[in-house]
Amino acid sequence: METLLKISGVDKSFPGVKALNNACLSVYAGRVMALMGENGAGKSTLMKVLTGIYSKDAGTIEYLNRSVNFNGPKASQEAGISIIHQELNLVGNLTIAENIFLGREFKTSWGAINWQKMHQEADKLLARLGVTHSSKQLCAELSIGEQQMVEIAKALSFESKVIIMDEPTDALTDTETEALFNVIRELKAENRGIVYISHRLKEIFQICDDVTVLRDGQFIGERIVAEITEDDLIEMMVGRRLDEQYPHLSQEKGECVLDVKNVSGSGIDDVSFKLHAGEIVGVSGLMGAGRTELGKLLYGALPKTAGKVRLKNQEIENLSPQDGLDNGIVYISEDRKGDGLVLGMSVKENMSLTSLDHFSQKGSIRHQAEKMTVDDFILMFNIKTPNRDQQVGLLSGGNQQKVAIARGLMTRPNVLILDEPTRGVDVGAKKEIYQLINEFKKEGLSILMISSDMPEVLGMSDRVLVMREGKISAEFSRKDATQEKLLAAAIGK
């Protein structure tokens, strides 16, 4: 078995945090190596050390049997190591082809950009991934899932020997995911090595040959996937067995808090449902069914064109997100970096951004009260950060999600709308978020949980609404809901 890449004994420290402590990873030709660990385990840091974004404090990196120390992503990419990042990194006002070949445009013999060649090559890459869009389309016009496929096409364009995929399927549909898996199988057949970073256990057992686990920055072990179970893998990741993945809380629901009647708007058509105090209603459906649009419309981020929304028996009109907040409705976006967090600001500033009025007295901010409240939320949510002043963009994906949810809760809402609450979150942090959601439910909060993860919807919800083409196509009680029923309602069978 040929080893393409071998990382051994790597250490990396930041002020107040030892991010990596004897981290190891091997990548083999023609095999897929899963890299797993809870958020904050050091996966992203290790990849940044490999590609030269961070310098290592100790350890060795061998690539194609030579010791290497890359001075940046460009150097590692030119050497044949490509990384597909978890968060999108495209220029919205450029076309798909321009994004794929940015800085590497094809030129004619007289030095002009060869647009025909560039679009032909981009279209070939898109076809390989099963994407039907023209490469001349602007990236800003694509969905998050479609933009992710462009990122993958961009990485494939380098024909690298080692390809690192960081949560590549998080925003993909089942069809897009299967297309990606087919590409991975092709890459394996070409003797390339793949590093597959994911929190989705099902995918690890579907597509990966080997798995390496990090915990708290340390190398825990490398295993052959065919020789372990999900429970074995979870125990390696979190140091304990997780007998119950979805800790559903059974309790009597309270009064009707949100009453939505015949609402239409951007991507929404004649939607009606009720949401009670202390109840979790899941919203399921395929990508493009209108789930996110429903959440944003109720919050005030998208316009309502028809219908009525009543909150605690009072009709409300949320013409803007500020109206939504004022009326006690909070929306936590699926795109935490696009719609949610301000990455250059601190944990404290992000968390208290929408609730500064709670800390105001006679026109000035009570900073001590703000700091104490933020510290309480950091403790309650188990947010892994050196301190409240840490830049939120430096936190792991799961900890960023916790900050986003904490910010929403700090406004003391009546209704919490969670859009893909565990997107990009590992299995251990997922359970922490589920337990937090249960605490909110116990306190009487009304929760609308939008998710493409059917087991999550089935595991946590008291009722499930299924959306298709902007309408609610079905509603199921917890005891009647099954994955088969949800899928049938989502596709119109």
Swiss-Prot record:
One Gene Ontology cellular component annotation held by this UniProt entry: plasma membrane
Membrane topology, from the record: Peripheral membrane protein
Enzyme superclass (EC): translocase
Complexes and interactors: The complex is composed of an ATP-binding protein (RbsA), two transmembrane proteins (RbsC) and a solute-binding protein (RbsB).
Name of the gene: rbsA
Function: Part of the ABC transporter complex RbsABC involved in ribose import. Responsible for energy coupling to the transport system.
Protein name in UniProt: Ribose import ATP-binding protein RbsA
Keywords for the protein's UniProt record, in alphabetical order: ATP-binding, Cell inner membrane, Cell membrane, Membrane, Nucleotide-binding, Repeat, Sugar transport, Translocase, Transport
Organism: Haemophilus influenzae (strain 86-028NP)
Catalysed reactions listed for this entry: D-ribose(out) + ATP + H2O = D-ribose(in) + ADP + phosphate + H(+)
Pfam families: ABC_tran
